[in-house]
Amino acid sequence: EFNSSTLYRYATVAVHELYKQLQGETAEAVQGFVRAFICSMPTGKQNTFANRTLPDAVLVTLRKDQPINLAGAFERPVRAGKNNDEGYAAASAKAFANYVGEVYNDWLGKPELSLVTGRFFAEIPDAQTYPLKDLLNTLTKELHNRLGNGRDGQ
């Protein structure tokens, strides 16, 4: 029997602390971390299960208040759509997007910036959707601007 589960991964980077150490290289370091985090997978059974699957959706946010772990979106098991008209990936993304909206409305509000890659996160409030390369470039540019070391169009 083979099981393909929803895998929710979460990481946080204290950019303000990283900036104290790296100064002008902070944005590039964050970009490298985000790229590696998105494109890497746990290595257990990597040959048995060919786990080089890329994510179906990615959400990157910049917040000034506190990081938010959104794992609560999967407190209940996600089921494929009625009559199997949508798969687990779409149903998981829908549950996640709904939960994100609830958390933003009920608790801390929207982040300063939300960047999305993947076809499933269109419902996330105020998220800008990009292919991965453009998401990383936009993130880097935003960090340069917010850290006060903007680099004319880079």
Outline where the language-model segments fall:
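Basic polyanion-binding and macromolecular-assembly surfaces
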Residues: 1-154
